[in-house]
């Protein structure tokens, strides 16, 4: 399956949305200053179904990065973990690369997002 599966679903702002509707505002801090963090990991097809490799460790590392970057995440690690699994299921992925991104939105603008 192509990375650009326009018929797929993306988890964004707490819910699954159609891929085509996963957009961010032009005034978002991330667009102007690149203020985002990401992780990259894989899910694999196994005889017992799809398994996300070391999911808890990846989510913990992402949240730790957000803490160091002073970026609040509006979801608990458990909610975020469920979101990853829900997205994999919603797209019927058996094997895939997962790239969660957390970014600063459009509530602040300027080099220092902490006025």
PLM segments and residue spans:
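Conserved alpha/beta cores of soluble small-molecule-handling proteins
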Residues: 1-115
């Amino acid at each position: 399956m192509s990375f650009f599966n326009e018929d797929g679903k993306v988890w964004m702002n707490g819910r699954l949305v159609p891929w085509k509707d996963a957009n961010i505002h032009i005034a978002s801090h991330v667009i102007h200053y690149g203020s985002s963090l990401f992780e990259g990991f894989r899910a694999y097809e196994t005889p017992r179904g799809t398994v996300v490799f070391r999911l808890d460790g990846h989510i913990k590392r992402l949240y730790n990065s957000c803490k160091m970057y002073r970026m609040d995440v509006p979801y608990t690690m458990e909610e975020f973990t469920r979101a990853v699994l829900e997205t994999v299921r919603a797209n019927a992925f058996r094997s895939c690369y997962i790239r969660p991104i957390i970014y600063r939105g459009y509530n602040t603008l300027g080099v220092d997002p902490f006025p």
